[in-house]
Amino acid sequence: MESAMDMAEAPNWKHNACGRKFVASFSGGKDSTLALYHAMNTGKPVGLIVVMEEEGRRSRSHGIPEAVIRAQAEAVGLPVHAAPASWEAYEKVFIGLLEQAKRQGAEVLVTGDLDMPAHGCWHDRVTRRAGLGLGMPLWERDHVETVREFIDLGFQAVLVTVNLSMGMREADLGRMITHELVDELAARGIDPCGESGEFHTLVIDGPIFRHPVPVRKREVVRDGEYAFLSIELDEAGGQDVPDSDRGR
Protein backbone atom coordinates (compact mmCIF):
# COMPACT_ATOMS: atom_id res chain seq x y z
CA MET A 1 0.00 0.00 0.00
CA GLU A 2 1.27 3.49 -0.84
CA SER A 3 1.96 5.81 2.07
CA ALA A 4 0.01 8.95 2.92
CA MET A 5 3.20 10.89 2.21
CA ASP A 6 3.17 9.70 -1.39
CA MET A 7 -0.36 10.97 -1.98
CA ALA A 8 0.31 14.23 -0.11
CA GLU A 9 3.00 15.03 -2.66
CA ALA A 10 0.64 14.48 -5.59
CA PRO A 11 0.02 18.23 -6.29
CA ASN A 12 3.72 18.64 -7.17
CA TRP A 13 3.38 16.07 -9.93
CA LYS A 14 1.88 18.68 -12.26
CA HIS A 15 4.94 20.89 -12.41
CA ASN A 16 7.96 18.67 -11.74
CA ALA A 17 9.16 18.80 -15.37
CA CYS A 18 9.47 22.60 -15.46
CA GLY A 19 13.00 23.56 -16.48
CA ARG A 20 14.29 20.00 -16.14
CA LYS A 21 15.42 17.25 -18.47
CA PHE A 22 12.76 14.59 -18.79
CA VAL A 23 11.91 11.29 -20.43
CA ALA A 24 8.27 10.63 -21.34
CA SER A 25 6.36 7.39 -20.94
CA PHE A 26 4.77 7.16 -24.38
CA SER A 27 1.81 5.01 -25.40
CA GLY A 28 1.20 6.68 -28.75
CA GLY A 29 -2.21 7.83 -27.50
CA LYS A 30 -3.73 11.22 -26.83
CA ASP A 31 -3.03 11.60 -23.10
CA SER A 32 0.67 10.73 -23.21
CA THR A 33 1.04 12.96 -26.28
CA LEU A 34 -0.72 15.92 -24.65
CA ALA A 35 1.42 15.49 -21.53
CA LEU A 36 4.51 15.43 -23.76
CA TYR A 37 3.33 18.65 -25.45
CA HIS A 38 3.00 20.47 -22.12
CA ALA A 39 6.30 19.11 -20.79
CA MET A 40 8.12 20.16 -23.97
CA ASN A 41 6.85 23.71 -23.43
CA THR A 42 8.53 23.94 -20.03
CA GLY A 43 11.20 21.24 -19.86
CA LYS A 44 13.89 19.59 -21.94
CA PRO A 45 13.02 16.20 -23.48
CA VAL A 46 15.70 13.54 -23.81
CA GLY A 47 13.52 10.78 -25.24
CA LEU A 48 10.51 8.48 -25.03
CA ILE A 49 10.20 5.10 -23.35
CA VAL A 50 7.86 2.31 -24.45
CA VAL A 51 7.35 -1.19 -23.08
CA MET A 52 6.57 -3.70 -25.81
CA GLU A 53 4.86 -7.09 -25.76
CA GLU A 54 7.17 -10.09 -25.32
CA GLU A 55 7.64 -10.53 -29.08
CA GLY A 56 8.60 -6.86 -29.41
CA ARG A 57 6.20 -6.20 -32.27
CA ARG A 58 3.52 -4.15 -30.47
CA SER A 59 3.37 -1.79 -27.51
CA ARG A 60 2.24 -3.36 -24.26
CA SER A 61 -0.22 -0.57 -23.37
CA HIS A 62 -2.10 0.16 -26.62
CA GLY A 63 -1.03 -2.63 -28.98
CA ILE A 64 0.53 -0.16 -31.43
CA PRO A 65 2.96 -1.70 -33.97
CA GLU A 66 6.60 -0.91 -33.26
CA ALA A 67 7.03 0.70 -36.69
CA VAL A 68 4.19 3.13 -35.95
CA ILE A 69 5.58 4.01 -32.50
CA ARG A 70 8.99 4.70 -34.03
CA ALA A 71 7.38 6.79 -36.78
CA GLN A 72 5.62 8.87 -34.11
CA ALA A 73 8.92 9.37 -32.27
CA GLU A 74 10.65 10.40 -35.49
CA ALA A 75 7.84 12.85 -36.24
CA VAL A 76 8.29 14.59 -32.87
CA GLY A 77 12.07 14.46 -33.22
CA LEU A 78 12.86 12.34 -30.16
CA PRO A 79 14.66 9.02 -29.70
CA VAL A 80 12.56 6.13 -28.43
CA HIS A 81 13.86 3.49 -26.05
CA ALA A 82 11.80 0.30 -26.13
CA ALA A 83 12.09 -3.05 -24.38
CA PRO A 84 9.87 -6.16 -24.44
CA ALA A 85 8.24 -7.45 -21.25
CA SER A 86 5.52 -9.74 -19.97
CA TRP A 87 3.00 -8.24 -17.55
CA GLU A 88 4.85 -10.08 -14.75
CA ALA A 89 8.17 -8.46 -15.68
CA TYR A 90 6.68 -5.08 -16.64
CA GLU A 91 7.77 -3.15 -13.55
CA LYS A 92 11.34 -4.45 -13.63
CA VAL A 93 11.71 -3.64 -17.32
CA PHE A 94 10.13 -0.20 -16.87
CA ILE A 95 12.56 0.66 -14.07
CA GLY A 96 15.41 -0.50 -16.30
CA LEU A 97 14.29 1.92 -19.00
CA LEU A 98 14.09 4.72 -16.42
CA GLU A 99 17.61 3.97 -15.21
CA GLN A 100 18.83 4.05 -18.81
CA ALA A 101 17.15 7.44 -19.32
CA LYS A 102 18.73 8.75 -16.12
CA ARG A 103 22.18 7.79 -17.39
CA GLN A 104 21.39 9.86 -20.49
CA GLY A 105 20.58 12.92 -18.39
CA ALA A 106 16.88 12.60 -17.55
CA GLU A 107 15.82 14.01 -14.18
CA VAL A 108 12.06 13.43 -14.40
CA LEU A 109 9.61 10.94 -15.89
CA VAL A 110 6.57 12.54 -17.57
CA THR A 111 3.32 10.56 -17.89
CA GLY A 112 -0.17 11.28 -19.19
CA ASP A 113 -2.10 10.14 -16.10
CA LEU A 114 -5.11 12.25 -15.15
CA ASP A 115 -6.50 11.11 -11.82
CA MET A 116 -6.22 7.37 -11.24
CA PRO A 117 -4.53 7.16 -7.79
CA ALA A 118 -3.21 3.65 -8.43
CA HIS A 119 -1.45 4.83 -11.59
CA GLY A 120 0.00 7.89 -9.90
CA CYS A 121 1.26 5.89 -6.93
CA TRP A 122 2.77 3.20 -9.17
CA HIS A 123 4.67 5.77 -11.21
CA ASP A 124 5.75 7.51 -8.00
CA ARG A 125 7.14 4.23 -6.66
CA VAL A 126 9.07 3.23 -9.78
CA THR A 127 10.54 6.70 -10.33
CA ARG A 128 11.75 6.77 -6.73
CA ARG A 129 13.44 3.41 -7.25
CA ALA A 130 15.12 4.73 -10.41
CA GLY A 131 16.17 7.98 -8.74
CA LEU A 132 13.97 10.22 -10.90
CA GLY A 133 11.27 12.77 -10.18
CA LEU A 134 7.71 12.40 -11.49
CA GLY A 135 5.88 14.90 -13.66
CA MET A 136 2.22 14.52 -14.65
CA PRO A 137 1.11 17.73 -16.42
CA LEU A 138 -2.50 16.54 -16.78
CA TRP A 139 -2.94 15.42 -13.18
CA GLU A 140 -6.38 16.19 -11.68
CA ARG A 141 -7.55 18.11 -14.74
CA ASP A 142 -11.16 17.99 -15.88
CA HIS A 143 -11.56 15.19 -18.41
CA VAL A 144 -13.74 17.05 -20.92
CA GLU A 145 -11.56 20.16 -20.71
CA THR A 146 -8.47 18.03 -21.33
CA VAL A 147 -9.74 16.27 -24.45
CA ARG A 148 -11.16 19.51 -25.87
CA GLU A 149 -7.78 21.19 -25.40
CA PHE A 150 -6.19 18.27 -27.27
CA ILE A 151 -8.56 18.87 -30.20
CA ASP A 152 -8.25 22.67 -30.15
CA LEU A 153 -4.45 22.47 -30.24
CA GLY A 154 -4.74 20.68 -33.58
CA PHE A 155 -3.86 17.14 -32.56
CA GLN A 156 -5.44 14.33 -34.57
CA ALA A 157 -6.08 10.93 -33.04
CA VAL A 158 -7.98 7.84 -34.13
CA LEU A 159 -9.73 5.27 -31.93
CA VAL A 160 -7.84 1.97 -32.16
CA THR A 161 -9.16 -0.02 -29.18
CA VAL A 162 -12.62 -0.10 -27.56
CA ASN A 163 -13.96 -1.92 -24.52
CA LEU A 164 -17.33 -3.28 -25.57
CA SER A 165 -18.37 -3.87 -21.95
CA MET A 166 -18.05 -0.15 -21.13
CA GLY A 167 -20.49 1.31 -23.65
CA MET A 168 -18.14 1.47 -26.62
CA ARG A 169 -19.07 -0.05 -29.98
CA GLU A 170 -17.09 -1.80 -32.66
CA ALA A 171 -18.31 0.90 -35.06
CA ASP A 172 -16.40 3.48 -32.98
CA LEU A 173 -13.09 2.06 -34.18
CA GLY A 174 -11.40 4.27 -36.75
CA ARG A 175 -13.27 7.40 -35.68
CA MET A 176 -11.29 10.57 -35.09
CA ILE A 177 -11.34 12.39 -31.76
CA THR A 178 -13.50 15.45 -32.48
CA HIS A 179 -15.70 17.81 -30.49
CA GLU A 180 -18.70 16.00 -31.94
CA LEU A 181 -17.41 12.66 -30.70
CA VAL A 182 -16.75 14.14 -27.24
CA ASP A 183 -20.37 15.30 -27.09
CA GLU A 184 -21.62 11.93 -28.30
CA LEU A 185 -19.56 9.94 -25.80
CA ALA A 186 -20.75 12.15 -22.95
CA ALA A 187 -24.36 11.63 -24.05
CA ARG A 188 -23.72 7.87 -24.01
CA GLY A 189 -22.41 8.10 -20.45
CA ILE A 190 -18.80 7.41 -21.47
CA ASP A 191 -15.77 9.31 -20.18
CA PRO A 192 -14.52 11.29 -23.23
CA CYS A 193 -10.95 10.75 -22.01
CA GLY A 194 -11.35 6.99 -21.69
CA GLU A 195 -9.36 7.17 -18.45
CA SER A 196 -10.80 3.92 -17.10
CA GLY A 197 -9.91 1.98 -20.25
CA GLU A 198 -13.07 2.59 -22.26
CA PHE A 199 -10.92 3.16 -25.37
CA HIS A 200 -7.41 3.85 -26.59
CA THR A 201 -6.24 6.17 -29.35
CA LEU A 202 -3.37 6.63 -31.79
CA VAL A 203 -2.11 10.17 -32.43
CA ILE A 204 -1.15 10.77 -36.04
CA ASP A 205 -0.52 14.53 -36.19
CA GLY A 206 -0.34 17.66 -34.07
CA PRO A 207 1.61 20.79 -33.16
CA ILE A 208 4.68 18.88 -31.94
CA PHE A 209 4.73 16.64 -35.04
CA ARG A 210 7.03 17.73 -37.86
CA HIS A 211 4.79 15.80 -40.27
CA PRO A 212 1.78 13.44 -40.05
CA VAL A 213 2.34 9.76 -39.31
CA PRO A 214 1.00 7.81 -42.31
CA VAL A 215 -1.03 4.79 -41.23
CA ARG A 216 -3.32 2.34 -42.96
CA LYS A 217 -6.31 0.65 -41.33
CA ARG A 218 -6.47 -3.09 -41.96
CA GLU A 219 -9.11 -5.04 -40.06
CA VAL A 220 -11.06 -5.24 -36.82
CA VAL A 221 -10.03 -7.96 -34.38
CA ARG A 222 -12.21 -9.14 -31.47
CA ASP A 223 -10.73 -10.47 -28.23
CA GLY A 224 -13.30 -11.04 -25.50
CA GLU A 225 -14.77 -7.72 -24.43
CA TYR A 226 -12.30 -5.77 -26.56
CA ALA A 227 -12.24 -4.86 -30.24
CA PHE A 228 -9.06 -3.63 -31.91
CA LEU A 229 -8.42 -1.80 -35.15
CA SER A 230 -5.41 -3.40 -36.79
CA ILE A 231 -3.20 -0.70 -38.28
CA GLU A 232 0.16 -0.53 -40.01
CA LEU A 233 2.60 2.13 -41.13
CA ASP A 234 1.91 3.22 -44.69
CA GLU A 235 5.39 3.26 -46.21
CA ALA A 236 3.98 4.99 -49.30
CA GLY A 237 3.12 8.00 -47.15
CA GLY A 238 -0.66 7.93 -47.56
CA GLN A 239 -3.12 8.62 -44.76
CA ASP A 240 -6.05 6.25 -44.39
CA VAL A 241 -8.20 8.53 -42.20
CA PRO A 242 -11.55 9.98 -43.32
CA ASP A 243 -11.35 13.74 -43.81
CA SER A 244 -14.96 14.16 -42.70
CA ASP A 245 -14.07 12.88 -39.23
CA ARG A 246 -11.07 15.07 -38.52
CA GLY A 247 -11.02 17.38 -35.50
CA ARG A 248 -11.90 21.03 -35.89
Language-model features, listed with the residues they occupy:
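Nucleotide-activated chemistry modules centered on ATP-dependent adenylation/adenylyltransferase
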Residues: 2-248
